[in-house]
UniProtKB/Swiss-Prot annotation:
Keyword annotations: Ribonucleoprotein, Ribosomal protein, RNA-binding, rRNA-binding
Organism: Desulforapulum autotrophicum (strain ATCC 43914 / DSM 3382 / VKM B-1955 / HRM2) (Desulfobacterium autotrophicum)
Family that this chain belongs to: Belongs to the universal ribosomal protein uL3 family.
Protein name as catalogued: Large ribosomal subunit protein uL3
HAMAP family in the cross-refs: Ribosomal_uL3_B (MF_01325_B)
Function as written in the Swiss-Prot or TrEMBL entry: One of the primary rRNA binding proteins, it binds directly near the 3'-end of the 23S rRNA, where it nucleates assembly of the 50S subunit.
Listed SUPFAM superfamilies: Translation proteins (SSF50447)
Gene Ontology cellular-component terms listed: cytosolic large ribosomal subunit
Molecular function via GO: rRNA binding; structural constituent of ribosome
Lineage summary: Bacteria, Pseudomonadati, Thermodesulfobacteriota, Desulfobacteria, Desulfobacterales
Length: 207
């Protein structure tokens, strides 16, 4: 059974569990995904499935993608991702992949792109402490010293400084599936997941 899927984040809400507790959940619409390519260890060196998600008309795809998607006998896709598998014998090009590999209570890892925050300072970006507010202090939100003077006479690599924040690939691990609605391709995952509404998400079974 395949244990990976592509989807879009819908938003957050809360539902009541069986014991009456209120559980915050993220609603995600996963799949359906189509197998656009099967990679085998004999030919490619490893076993993997290439999945297409979010259908797109072939007329809006470039020629290399049209040729690639035509082999699967399906329309074009906006998103194509690769998932490693142990064995590819049970899969074929053009096959639809659903939520059969997931069940309520499973632990999953969810990957996505974090929200963009623009240019941010060290307090917001790295969690620095702020300076004193009174007694003539003029160092309220400044980062402070960023290096030495005589030696090494440069700013070392990796120094935490102000800059662009967000739009990074993030993975949240061991999230619990609270509910699955196969008819609507909806999965409710406990807690928040990376990204904005309608953002692309990848779900994998936690090891």
């Amino acid at each position: 059974m395949f244990k990976g899927m592509l989807g879009k984040k819908i938003g957050m809400t809360s539902i009541f569990a069986a014991d009456g507790t209120l559980v915050p959940v993220t609603v995600v619409r996963f799949g359906p995904c189509v197998v656009t390519q099967v990679k085998a260890e004999k030919t490619d060196g490893y076993n993997a499935l290439q999945l297409g998600f979010d259908e797109r008309a072939l007329a809006k795809c470039n020629k290399p993608k049209v040729g690639h998607f035509s082999k699967s006998g399906s329309t074009g896709f906006n998103v194509v991702r690769e998932f490693r598998v142990e064995n590819t014998d049970e899969f074929e090009v053009g096959q639809n992949i659903g939520l059969d590999g997931f069940a309520i209570g499973d632990k999953v890892n969810v990957s996505g792109t974090s929200k963009g925050r623009g240019f941010a300072g060290t307090i917001k970006r790295h969690g620095f402490s702020r300076g004193p507010e009174t007694h003539g202090c003029r160092n309220h939100r400044k980062p402070g010293s960023i290096g030495c003077s005589a030696w090494p006479a440069r700013v070392v690599k990796g120094r935490r400084m102000p800059g662009h924040m967000g739009v990074d690939r993030k993975t949240v691990k061991n999230l619990e599936i609270i509910d699955i609605r196969p008819d609507e391709n909806l999965v409710m995952i406990k807690g928040p997941v990376p990204g904005w509404k309608t953002g692309l998400l990848e779900i994998r079974k936690a090891v």
